[in-house]
């Protein structure tokens, strides 16, 4: 009887400890406060494990598995039935940033639905998450580059206007508490086209 009582008390203590509301779980705190609290609780090994695109679960802190690999260049990518919009280079030819923002508002709504459905089914695979590697804002100045169709062309001004519209459409109203999706503009470090000397120059000549 004593052993049974001890077991019950231990289980209750474990459940109470797990259900404890840590500051990082409090939506009333700012994102910075919540992130700082969570990072202070994670070990170095746990932090490293979260740095890959395929982040494992950390059950003791209620962190579910998450896959950061997702795209929405012209609609929800590789994720079953979804609206397929024209490629970016085609939409750039419209010069209509208002329409482009509406397009990506629709795309983000569809992706949110797909995320919720996947999460309910325990699916944390690629192309299921709320982070998208979109838009591609490389300046397309050489037709030999095989990813030019992902961009909004060769004009920096048009790229700026259209890129902003895409981000606003994906993330939603800036007055709301949370973004609909998180947009990741690419490519800053790599995949910048066939110009091999792009990242090498003499700063003394600038």
Where are these regions (language model features)?
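Glycoside hydrolase catalytic-domain context in secreted enzymes
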Residues: 20-206
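Bacterial Sec-dependent N-terminal signal peptides
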Residues: 1-21
């Amino acid at each position: 009887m004593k052993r049974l009582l001890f077991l019950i008390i231990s289980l209750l203590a474990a459940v109470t400890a797990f259900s404890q509301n840590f500051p990082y779980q409090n939506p009333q705190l700012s994102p910075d406060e919540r992130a700082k609290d969570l990072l202070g609780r994670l070990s170095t090994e746990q932090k490293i494990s979260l740095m890959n695109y395929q982040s494992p679960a950390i059950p003791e802190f209620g962190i579910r598995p998450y896959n950061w690999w997702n795209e929405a260049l012209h609609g929800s990518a590789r994720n079953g039935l979804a609206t397929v919009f024209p490629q970016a280079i085609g939409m750039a030819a419209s010069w209509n940033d208002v329409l482009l923002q509406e397009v990506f508002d629709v795309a983000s709504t569809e992706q949110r639905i797909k995320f919720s459905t996947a999460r309910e089914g325990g699916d944390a695979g690629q192309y299921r998450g709320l982070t998208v590697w979109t838009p591609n804002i490389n300046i397309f100045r050489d037709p030999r580059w095989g990813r030019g169709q992902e961009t909004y062309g060769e004009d920096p001004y048009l790229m700026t206007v259209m890129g902003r519209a895409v981000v606003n459409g994906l993330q939603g109203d800036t007055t709301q508490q949370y973004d609909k999706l998180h947009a990741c503009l690419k490519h800053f470090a790599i995949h910048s086209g066939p110009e091999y000397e792009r990242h090498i120059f003499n700063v003394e000549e600038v």
